[in-house]
Amino acid sequence: MAAPGPALCLFDVDGTLTAPRQKITKDMDCFLQKLRQKIKIGVVGGSDFEKVQEQLGDDVIKKYDYVFPENGLVAYRDGKLLCKQNIQGHLGEALIQDLINYCLSYIAKIKLPKKRGTFIEFRNGMLNVSPIGRSCSQEERIEFYELDQKENIRQKFVEDLRKEFAGKGLTFSIGGQISFDVFPDGWDKRYCLGHVEKDGYKTIYFFGDKTMPGGNDHEIFTDPRTVGYTVAAPEDTRRICEELFC
């Protein structure tokens, strides 16, 4: 059972509310709206706002009390924009260009079954780096993910970057199936907690699938301000929520 007092449920998106990069099912959407009648709900993801809308609906800011794209660097509360940070102002153009150039050079040397386009996506609060390219098809995405599980393509890439850019104040975080994020230290999903902790919640529950060390849910999952739950699929998320709140 849930702890007494005002509480908030924060959900990761991919692998938690939806299948990776897929739209939320009607059943899951309806369940969350019923859950919202009992507890405040919010979403926090690494993707930009447009991708969150693609997965959770154009009216996402009306369906959730909090919406935190890009780890909360872009923040909505009660349907209104709270703030928007940007990575270039924090890191400076020189470091960003060094990082982009190095990543492109590394990707050029990787031999994969397939490569597509959009290898680096520049977002407000991070760079998203994809060895296969974000424009790959769903079938190609799955093919890369299965290969990555065997050969640790992203993990090796990240380890190389950590050595090359040591001391530069950068965090490298693997999430989803085909990419990893690069952002300033402290700009992981914990960033969104700064927006909600002043709203008086006694308990902040967090649900995510990439909660292991190196995963992009790990920091917020282990943060003392949250009660974390690891899930493997949206069905897990629903089951745990039903046990806690229904």
Curated annotation (Swiss-Prot):
Gene3D superfamilies reported in the protein's UniProt record: 3.30.1240.20, HAD superfamily/HAD-like (3.40.50.1000)
Pfam families cross-referenced by the UniProt entry: PMM
Pathway assigned in UniProt: Nucleotide-sugar biosynthesis; GDP-alpha-D-mannose biosynthesis; alpha-D-mannose 1-phosphate from D-fructose 6-phosphate: step 2/2
Binding site for alpha-D-mannose 1-phosphate: R21, R123, R134, R141, S179, D181
Active site, renumbered: D12 (nucleophile), D14 (proton donor/acceptor)
UniProt keyword annotations, A-Z: Acetylation, Cytoplasm, Isomerase, Magnesium, Metal-binding
Protein name: Phosphomannomutase 2
N-terminal signal peptide: none
Binding site for Mg(2+) 1: D12, D14, D209
Binding site residues for Mg(2+) 2: F221, D223, T226
Reactions catalysed: alpha-D-mannose 1-phosphate = D-mannose 6-phosphate
Superkingdom, natural source: Eukaryota
Enzyme superclass (EC): isomerase
UniProt modified residues of type N-acetylalanine: A2
Protein family membership: Belongs to the eukaryotic PMM family.
Function description: Involved in the synthesis of the GDP-mannose and dolichol-phosphate-mannose required for a number of critical mannosyl transfer reactions.
GO molecular-function term, one example from the UniProt record: phosphomannomutase activity
Organism encoding this protein: Bos taurus (Bovine)
Compartments reported by the entry: Cytoplasm
InterPro entries with a match to the protein in the record: HAD-like_sf, HAD-SF_hydro_IIB, HAD_sf, PMM, PMM_cap
Subunit structure: Homodimer.
Gene that encodes the chain: PMM2
The EC number(s) this enzyme carries: 5.4.2.8
GO biological process, one term: protein N-linked glycosylation
This protein's GO CC annotations: cytosol
